[in-house]
């Protein structure tokens, strides 16, 4: 296997879909105590989501509670309750190029700005003839880590607290 020219630093987010966001809020916000830190709404992505935080500082994990704007349209963010996971990447453009060269299939849209303000792209849940490597049923979001996240994970890896 080739030497990987980038690092997966940690989990950036978990996205949970449901037909009714209020039911998700009951558990995640009201009972588990996650804080709603923002919202994101996109006709193109057929999503209305609350962006919540689990933990603090640069190592916090984003938990997105999502419902479709129109349950009859795609993408159907509620059809798979665990919609996707997001991974912090230290150098997203390098990662995308290298993974593409290794046969990884990406979802349409390329690198773009995500709902939380970071550059993102998605590994497709299924491989294809041209790009045989996919997420084996899981949509995986690759997220460009900001400098403070890269520094925090580097310090953690080096045993610095």
Region roles according to the model:
Residues 1-25, 82-89, 143-161:
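N-terminal beta-strand motif that seeds the catalytic metal site of vicinal oxygen chelate
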Residues 2, 29-30, 41:
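A short, N-terminal "cap"/entry segment at the start of jelly-roll beta-barrel domains
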Residues 2-5, 10-19, 50-55, 73-161:
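Vicinal oxygen chelate
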Residues 8, 31-33, 79, 136:
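Alpha-helix termination/capping residues and helix-transition junctions
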Residues 20-35, 95-102:
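Amphipathic alpha-helical segments
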Residues 35, 88, 105:
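Residue-level detector of anion-binding/catalytic polar loops
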Residues 35-76, 116-146:
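Conserved short beta-strand elements that form part of the metal-binding/catalytic scaffold
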């Amino acid at each position: 296997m080739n030497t990987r020219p980038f690092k997966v630093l940690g989990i950036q987010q978990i996205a949970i879909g449901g037909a009714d966001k209020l039911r998700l809020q009951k558990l995640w916000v009201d009972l588990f105590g996650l804080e709603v830190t923002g919202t994101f709404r996109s006709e193109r992505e057929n999503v209305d989501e609350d962006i919540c935080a689990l933990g603090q500082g640069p190592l916090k994990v984003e938990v997105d509670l999502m419902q479709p704007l129109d349950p009859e349209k795609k993408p159907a963010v509620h059809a798979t309750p665990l919609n996707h996971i997001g991974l912090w990447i230290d150098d997203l453009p390098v990662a995308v190029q290298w993974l593409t060269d290794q046969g990884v299939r990406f979802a349409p849209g390329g690198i773009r700005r995500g709902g939380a303000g970071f550059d993102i792209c998605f590994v497709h849940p299924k491989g294809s003839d041209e790009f045989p490597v996919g997420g084996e049923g899981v949509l995986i979001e690759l997220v460009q880590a900001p400098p403070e996240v890269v520094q925090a994970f580097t310090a953690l890896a080096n045993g610095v607290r």
